[in-house]
A protein has these predicted regions:
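Alpha-helix C-terminal capping segments
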Residues: 20-22, 68-72, 198-206
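Short, solvent-exposed loop/turn segments at secondary-structure junctions
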Residues: 11-12, 34-36, 98, 153-154
Length: 207
């Protein structure tokens, strides 16, 4: 007889199973997949630790949370700093001062504000009818054409002019030269992958 039957061996299920077991409860975890870890499952591909279901970067500003996950695995100091390649030109993401300098040669936050105001002036009184118009109203045509249009159309599989404007409510603009994607104090990826965390959480649990 079990106290808890947990459906899903992902992070949430594994944490609950670990905490319940620690408190003396008898737990069983089941999952329809043939592996534990859920969407943070990692696999070794020719010596490379691959996040099978897409990249997951752990980040938090809560020290209690950070200390908790670090008891199950050692984390590296990976900082996510995405770069977009548009026809051979490189741009930092999210949009920040480095992005704007590469795009326009602007060097100060005020220059960026002035440039964006100039780029979006013609859309001031326009009610966007589609995603393209919404993006241009928010950030202007230069950024839209180079860093939003292609990615968005590939993601949705249709023209940006056929997508509703509400998909983009706002676009993050950072007026600093910090390329860190996240603002959290703690971040990284567990050395050896997330499997290490899940395996350590479930080592005393029936799966």
């Amino acid at each position: 007889m079990y106290d808890y039957l947990i459906v899903g061996a992902g992070l949430s299920g594994a944490i609950f199973a670990y905490e319940a077991t620690k408190r003396g409860k008898k737990v069983k975890v089941i999952d329809k997949r043939n592996h534990i870890g859920g969407n943070i499952y990692c696999e070794d591909v020719e010596g490379i630790n691959v996040h099978k279901y897409g990249a997951h970067i752990f980040h938090t500003s809560n020290k209690k949370v950070w200390d908790y996950v670090n008891q199950f695995a050692e984390f590296n100091n990976y900082i996510n700093s995405p770069i977009a390649n548009y026809k051979g030109s490189l741009y930092n993401l999210p949009f920040n001062m480095n992005t704007f300098y590469a795009m326009w040669g602007t060097k100060t936050p005020q220059e960026v504000k002035d440039k964006i105001a100039e780029q979006t002036a013609h859309m001031k009184d326009v009610e966007p009818k589609n995603l393209e118009e919404q993006a241009i109203k928010l950030i202007g045509p230069d950024i839209y054409e180079k860093l939003i249009k292609g990615y968005t159309e590939k993601q949705w599989g249709r023209s940006a002019t056929d997508l509703p404007p509400f998909i983009i409510k706002r676009l993050p603009v950072r007026l600093t030269f910090d390329n860190n994607y996240f603002n959290d104090h703690y971040q990284g990826i567990p050395i050896g992958g997330y499997n290490v965390i899940i395996e350590n959480m479930l080592k005393d649990v029936e799966v």
